[in-house]
Amino acid sequence: MANAREAAVKTLYKIEYEDAYSNLALKEQLAASDLDTRDKAFVSALVYGAVQRKKELEYIISSFSKIKLKKISKYILIILKLGIYQLLYMDKIPASAAVNESVRLARRYGHASSAGFVNGILRNVDRNRGNLPKPADRLEAIAVKYSFPEWLVSRWI
């Protein structure tokens, strides 16, 4: 599944930073890969899950990181999102696999210190899995939980 995770990183990068449509970017990436059916399903689940929970994943990263999101390398931010998504929402993926593969990807796509940064954030999230930080403001909490913009949530409440 190592290649599958890298395919997910590349796909999410295109979606977030090259304004690609998620379905088209995923279809293109999967067509170009030699992944088997199971790995393609894994990539799809990772990409669509990270897209769906983008705001929540970013909130978690910002809660555990001393570095602001805008200062984190684009690839490292994507690797963190995918790693956290695996830890929190993919029950069949062992935490050790999610962390170790994310660290391996961080070594490949980041600086020397990136691997330690990713390892620290993911292990901290895993340790605090049952007690993750939540926004104090009700409006922001709903926006983060469902990954909707706050202005839209304010119209519904």
Model-found features: residue ranges?
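Class I Rossmann-like S-adenosyl-L-methionine
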Residues: 1-157
